[in-house]
Amino acid sequence: MRYPGGLSKAVTFSYDDGVVQDMRLVEILDKHGLKGTFNLNTSSFGPGKVNWSSRRMTAEQIVALFKNSPHEVAVHTLNHPFLEQLPPNMATYEVLGDRKNIEDIFGTVCRGMAYPFGFSFSA
């Protein structure tokens, strides 16, 4: 498999939840000409939305950081639930609702997704 420029290897950087530390990560990635994927929960922007809301960026900060940046913004569900514990219709709502919000906010097609809490099967 080849990547752009004929390269045979690639590295990815992926960060979840839209936390304030992402602002510093974007600075570092930009400084070195690297791109990252930032997986956002669009119902959890800003203070008062989740238990650790002081770590979350506001909607305004998210837009300012990513609206015209080279970084990918991807689905991470609306509310960060354990998807495997939800009925199929609720899991679908979480994923598609987050995708719609991201596409509305950034005016682009959203293709990526990261499962909240990771994903694994018990043996």
Where are these regions (language model features)?
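Metal-dependent polysaccharide deacetylase catalytic core of the NodB/CE4 family, i.e.
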Residues: 30-123
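Generic enzyme active-site microenvironment
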Residues: 12-15, 74
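Short, glycine/acidic-enriched loop or turn micro-motifs at the edges of active sites
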Residues: 19-20, 79
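Short, glycine/serine-rich, charged loops/turns that create anion-binding
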Residues: 18-19, 43
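A short acidic, amphipathic alpha-helical/loop segment
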Residues: 24-28
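Generic hydrophobic alpha-helical membrane-span motif
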Residues: 22-23, 82
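Short acidic donor-binding/metal-coordinating loop in glycosyltransferase active sites
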Residues: 15-17, 115
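N-terminal pre-catalytic segment of deacetylase/amide-hydrolase enzymes
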Residues: 1-13, 20, 54-56, 62-63
